[in-house]
A protein has these predicted regions:
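Small-residue-rich segments of transmembrane alpha-helices in multi-pass membrane proteins
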Residues: 1-3, 81-85, 137-139, 188-196, ...
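Hydrophobic alpha-helical segments of integral membrane proteins
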Residues: 18-34, 62, 136, 140-155, ...
């Protein structure tokens, strides 16, 4: 899986406190916007350049080290689901629709959607940065070994979730006769990539395809959300809150873009 080396690298870098560099720089600005501690802001910045469920991996690392609260973790999960830039611009924009601008606009909408969620969930109380710093007592070989094991376990979780949702979609395709339009939306709610591809195959206007793709990318799909919930299964994350917030803001973003296209 392409995410496997990323999981290993992020775990190694986290062990050596690379996120502290981010929190002391641009992270300070993000922390003011969302009223979160600057360590939490580093998760938002890192997820901009990686892909989900990377946010769950970062959040789990911080929860394991008591660097953030469960409430902050639940809130962060709501607004740190960023699709891969390469996937949105390269696969969706260029490969499926023949336009990098198509993909670029999609990614910018996802970014704005997450920022709005973060502002909506903005903490009412002041956040105080903790001074917790991970002690780096292990040698590099132990760190790499532990990171590889974490990477393998997490990759199996992701792969298993993908297989389950792919099987569900295939069963629906085989035994249920659904309108292609509805099938595209339903597939996207279940599994992001399948939904995006099915929507691109629908005989409809480019504007309608764009709107449906916006909804799917902003919602992230149940497959990706459940990957995150599984990674964080040892913690009592507010799953209901995350699902409701993601769904509502996905609808709001899609409807807003629809109104803009009418102008």
């Amino acid at each position: 899986m392409s995410i496997f080396p990323f999981i290993i690298l992020s775990d190694i870098l986290y062990y050596y406190n690379y996120h502290l560099f981010l929190k002391d720089n641009i992270g300070a600005l993000i922390s003011k916007i969302f009223n979160i501690n600057s360590k939490s802001s580093s998760i938002f910045l890192l997820c901009l350049f990686t892909s989900h469920p990377g946010n769950a991996i970062y959040i789990k690392n911080m929860l394991d080290n008591d660097e953030i609260s469960l409430n902050d973790a639940s809130n962060l999960l709501c607004y740190t689901y960023f699709p891969s830039i390469a996937f949105v611009i390269g696969t969706i924009g260029i490969s499926l629709y023949g336009s990098y601008r198509f993909g670029l606009y999609l990614y910018l909408i996802c970014l704005i959607n997450n920022i709005l969620i973060g502002i909506f969930l903005r903490n009412k109380n002041d956040n105080i940065d903790s001074d917790i710093v991970i002690n780096n007592n292990s040698n590099i070989f132990d760190v790499i070994s532990n990171s590889i094991m974490k990477g393998i376990n997490t990759s199996f979780i992701i792969l298993g979730t993908l297989i389950i949702f792919t099987i569900i979609i295939n069963l629906i395709l085989r035994y249920v006769n659904i309108n292609p339009y509805i099938l595209g939306i339903f597939s996207g709610i279940l599994e992001l990539t399948s939904g995006v591809i099915k929507i691109s195959d629908i005989s409809n206007s480019i504007n309608n395809k764009f709107l449906l793709t916006v909804f799917i990318l902003c919602f992230s799909s149940l497959s990706i959300l459940f990957q995150s919930f599984t990674i964080l299964s040892k913690y009592k994350i507010n799953i209901k809150k995350i699902l409701i917030v993601k769904l509502i803001f996905s609808i709001i973003s899609t409807f807003t873009i629809y109104l803009i296209t009418l102008i």
